[in-house]
């Protein structure tokens, strides 16, 4: 049976501000069959890459990455916001509409030479994923691909990570 994943995405106009259409993956996550099928598609992609570790940024990267890591039998390393990790970290900043934000990872989260898949719910401007990739590489990891439920094409996030393989289930 083939699932049309877009049937499980709620499009909310004018959220969080006028002119923006928010793509809500909550319906996808709340439907066990659809969530499992979406996860399985990313698992299939990851198997072909020889993935040894999944890394995902807070918070929705966890939603995508953790079940993929579980299915593959590999670890998951979170990229967190400030003050969330108790041990020594590396960090990378990225631009926001007004200012910047910073993500952190434990220094031992990724081993040198480890093949890493970076996951998130969606690829928008690419800043979060680019920052996550920067930390993985600083730790010596090899980013073998990126995976998303959704790519928002008009925001050109692909440009920030153009040197990496990109897998997405759907695009808007």
UniProtKB/Swiss-Prot annotation:
It comes from the Bacteria. Keywords: Cytoplasm, Glycosyltransferase, Purine salvage, Transferase. The keyword Nucleus does not apply. Its EC number is 2.4.2.7. Belongs to the purine/pyrimidine phosphoribosyltransferase family. It is found in: Cytoplasm. Pathway: Purine metabolism; AMP biosynthesis via salvage pathway; AMP from adenine: step 1/1. Homodimer. Catalyzes a salvage reaction resulting in the formation of AMP, that is energically less costly than de novo synthesis. It catalyses: AMP + diphosphate = 5-phospho-alpha-D-ribose 1-diphosphate + adenine. GO terms for molecular function: adenine binding; adenine phosphoribosyltransferase activity; AMP binding. This is Adenine phosphoribosyltransferase. It comes from Latilactobacillus sakei subsp. sakei (strain 23K) (Lactobacillus sakei subsp. sakei). GO terms for cellular component: cytoplasm. GO terms for biological process: adenine salvage; AMP salvage; purine ribonucleoside salvage.
């Amino acid at each position: 049976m083939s699932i049309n994943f877009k049937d499980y995405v709620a499009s909310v106009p004018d959220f969080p501000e006028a002119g923006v259409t928010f793509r809500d993956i909550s319906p996808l996550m709340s439907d066990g069959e659809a969530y499992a099928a979406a996860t399985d598609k990313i698992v299939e992609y990851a198997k072909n890459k020889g993935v040894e570790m999944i890394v995902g940024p807070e918070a929705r990267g966890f939603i995508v990455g953790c079940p993929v890591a579980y299915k593959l039998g590999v670890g998951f390393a979170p990229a967190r916001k400030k003050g969330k990790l108790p041990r020594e970290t590396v960090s990378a900043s990225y631009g926001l509409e007004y200012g910047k934000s910073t993500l952190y990872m434990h220094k031992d989260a990724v081993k040198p030479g480890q093949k890493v898949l970076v996951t998130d719910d969606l690829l928008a401007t690419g800043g979060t994923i680019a920052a996550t990739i920067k930390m993985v590489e600083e730790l010596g990891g090899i980013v073998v691909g990126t995976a998303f439920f959704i790519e928002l094409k008009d925001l050109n996030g692909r440009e920030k990570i153009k040197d990496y393989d990109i897998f997405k289930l759907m695009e808007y």
